Amino acid sequence: ADYLKLAGYNYTEKLYDEHHEKHPDWVIYGSETASTVRSRGIYHLPYDTGLLVYDDLQCSDLGNSVVNWGASPFRSFAMDAAAEYSMGQFVWTGFDYIGEPTPYNTKNSYFGIIDTAGFEKDSFWFYKSVWDIAEEESFIHVSPCCWDFNEGQLIDVLVYSDLPFIRLHYCGEMYDGKVIDHLTEDKLCARFTVPFHKNKPLAVRGYLSPDC
């Protein structure tokens, strides 16, 4: 690395600051990061009790299934963003693929942002919210994308958007508001917890200003 002045780090973003201080002339980047495993459209709750795999042999698309050598998309992105000298990161992986069965025993991995059928997992919308610099229409993506749970069950709702001010409306009224800040780890998405009630509408709105 000292010869090329270029250093890629696999799952060791924690070393960035130390190595940058020792070698300020190095170009540092994340050569392999994240490794969150997800089954598209499968949600296991609560969010804070994430497991690699559940009794149904599926991972959770909330982003709370992480391998022991990896990090959540939020943690991985935040560590990279905090290192202003970092060139960026390569996330493992863009697509699910056959082989390296994780979790075992299945024929394919679940690391992808997009599954083997070409459909976006919820992490796609997170990365779009923080990476997309094109002048496109603003968007909101709500996770879980399905709304079918047990009556009264507390549901963690994650909202990804390029809009900074998010309001959640539930049961016909404004339920709560959050601020998204793409430079702060615990504000990379808007997170709400609501009790599930069948046939009660849930809607999310995003704004550029808190005064809207």
Positions of PLM-derived features:
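Extended substrate-binding grooves/exosites of carbohydrate-active enzymes
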Residues: 1-211
